[in-house]
A protein has these predicted regions:
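A short beta-strand motif characteristic of beta-propeller blades
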Residues: 230-240, 275-281, 315-325, 364-373, ...
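Immunoglobulin-like IPT/TIG beta-sandwich domains and homologous Ig-like subdomains
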Residues: 71-99, 103-105, 145-215, 267
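C-terminal motif of bacterial Sec signal peptides marking the signal peptidase cleavage site
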Residues: 18-21
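Repeated scaffold domains used in trafficking and secretory/extracellular systems
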Residues: 242-249, 285-291, 326-336, 371-386, ...
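Beta-strand/beta-sandwich contexts
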Residues: 28, 35-61, 136-171, 214-245
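Short glycine/acidic-enriched loop and turn motifs that connect beta-strands
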Residues: 263-266, 305-306, 348-353, 394-400, ...
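Hydrophobic beta-strand positions that form the internal "hydrophobic ladder"
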Residues: 257, 298, 342-343, 389, ...
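Blade-level signature of beta-propeller repeat domains, shared across WD40, Kelch, NHL, RCC1
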Residues: 506-536
Length: 536
């Protein structure tokens, strides 16, 4: 219960005059208060909307009242203030922030009471009638993201839908455009898992149906369905010789390859019937790149800032400086989760534990959750559905193994996995749903981080097929792309090789990426880029 009180201040002589005018002041009459309305309603389009403007009420107070109390309670109300002029009180009601409340229907009450003297000496007060104002505040759910946001034409699959308010109102259906999900499960107030049927290429707004919602449900999520690419095997040259490739990403929506290379450059190779010459953008001290959860931004991580870049034009947008970092600490790598956050690791010139951060892509800012671990030059790798990000750390030079962590987007928490090892130069690789995880390019684990088997120690780079049935490696001994059956029982602890294909020699420092359908591999090293249909 919250109180706003005020007394009418009068001089002693005037007070006596008022009492004289009041008669005996015996309290036989109640103070009478009236108000302009007894019902106030607020609404916001979603929990992400701005706070609605305050509303103003007018109360008329009995002229003989000497004291006014305004009481309020309930989650709908942030504050109540009022000013008194003569017998009129102007009451200002400020609603709570939608972001603080979340989705739902929230209530509150405001009580206005005037008090008058109960006896001629005014030694005690008597209350008059109470005016009660009922406040109702309605906030519908919001759909923020779908992950992966790219689907493959003619292929049924499952997506993770993230938002807020999914358990505040009964969700009766999920649609991708005009097509209903085949099944869906409300996992939590912020997550729905939905299966969708085979769709044709196009863009499909993702929406939920909840008839009890107090208003239209805002959705910011679009599923982009693309045809599986049919790229011929080829190689692509760099604009400058022998770059060090720091990151390689495939933009399936726009049919483009995006690379971060040393010297602070982003390279973009677009496909339009054939691969074109690269366009470039400069980002000083560039260390990593990743597409945002919705694919609308390319996140370019430099050692001292993160810049949002248009993935089609490479035009620079919002720049967010790094949090306050200790001397010799820098922003190192990032991976994107389905909650709209990027997990950002930091590094140190040497061996030392440094902070891990989250970066919010739609309201650009860094934060450090309570569960975020301090790690030794950690490298993240994420699943395509953004549900899980794995963080390996350490160095082969360390005497003892270091713990592997993960970030679970569903709970927005970091935790240890139970696996300990020292990372090498190969980043963690995961399938679409994080059911198969490859660490150090050789060790394969299931979703519970149970060790399953190994890949060759000659692996230089690895990706996992989205459906988790294959691992594809670039092998230093064979100078080929090798394929391994992850559904088979490892013989002697090693997964069986079932295929191989000759790739154009990418050189050293190889990075790999895979198309969403699992049919095309991309390899980039210091020599060139190789585009290669995946072996069986």
């Amino acid at each position: 219960m919250r109180f706003v009180t005020s007394a009418r201040r009068v001089s002693a002589l005037l007070f006596v005059a008022v009492l004289s005018a009041c008669g005996s002041g015996d309290g036989s009459q109640q103070s009478s208060t009236s108000i302009s309305t007894n019902d106030v309603s607020f609404s916001a389009a979603s929990p992400d909307a701005s706070t609605p403007p305050a509303q103003i009420l007018t109360a008329t107070i009995d002229p003989e009242a000497i004291y006014v109390a305004v009481l309020h309670n309930g989650a709908a109300i942030a504050s109540v203030t009022y000013s008194l002029s003569g017998d009129t009180a102007q009451i200002v009601v400020d609603p709570a922030s939608p972001g603080g409340l979340g989705a739902g229907v929230f209530t509150g009450t405001i009580t206005v009471v005037g008090y008058r003297c109960a006896d001629p000496a005014c030694s005690r007060l008597v209350s008059g009638n109470s005016q009660i104002v009922n406040v109702v505040y309605q906030i519908p759910p919001v759909v923020r993201f779908v992950a992966p946001y790219v689907g493959v034409a003619a292929t049924a699959d499952t997506a993770v839908i993230r938002g807020q308010g999914f358990q505040k109102f009964t969700v009766e259906g999920v649609t991708f455009g005009a097509t209903a999900a085949t099944t869906f499960t409300v996992v939590s107030d912020t997550e729905i898992r939905a299966s969708y049927p085979a769709l044709t290429a196009g863009t499909y707004p993702v929406q939920i149906q909840a008839s009890s919602s107090p208003g239209a449900i805002t959705s910011l999520a679009n599923m982009v369905v693309v045809n599986a690419p049919a790229y011929a095997a080829t190689t692509l040259a760099y604009p400058s010789a022998a770059p060090q490739v720091q990151a390689l990403r495939y933009d399936a929506e726009r049919q483009a390859l995006l690379l971060a290379v040393n010297g602070g450059q982003i390279l973009r190779y677009a496909y339009a019937g054939a691969w074109g010459a690269p366009t470039t953008a400069a980002v000083g001290s560039l260390s990593d790149i990743a597409l945002s959860t919705d694919g609308q931004q390319l996140l370019a991580l430099a050692q001292t800032a993160l810049t949002q870049i248009d993935p089609a034009t490479l035009a620079a947008g919002t720049v967010t400086p790094a949090p306050a970092l200790a001397a010799d600490v820098f922003l190192k790598n990032l991976a994107v989760a389905n909650d709209g956050n990027a997990v950002v690791t930091t590094g140190y010139n040497g061996s030392s534990n440094t902070q891990t951060y989250l970066y919010a892509t739609r309201s650009p800012a860094f934060s450090q959750p309570a569960t975020a671990p301090s790690m030794d030059n950690s490298t993240p790798g994420g699943s395509a559905d953004g549900s899980s990000i794995v963080l390996a750390q350490g160095s082969p030079a360390l005497a003892s193994a270091t713990g592997v962590y993960r970030y679970l987007a569903a709970s927005q928490t970091f935790s240890v996995t139970g696996v300990s090892l020292n990372q090498n130069s190969i980043a963690p690789a995961l399938d679409r749903a994080a059911t198969r995880i490859v660490l150090n390019g050789t060790n394969v684990y299931d979703a519970g981080y149970n060790f399953l088997g190994t890949l060759p120690s000659t692996t230089l780079a690895v990706v996992v097929k989205p459906d988790a049935t294959r691992a594809y490696t670039f092998d230093s001994a064979a100078s080929q792309v090798l394929s391994f059956d992850l559904t088979a029982s490892p013989a002697g602890g090693a997964f069986p090789q079932i295929g191989a294909t000759a790739a154009g020699d990418p050189g050293t420092g190889v990075r790999m990426a895979i198309s969403p359908d699992g049919g095309t591999l991309f390899l980039a090293g210091n020599n060139q880029i190789a585009v290669q249909p995946a072996p069986p």
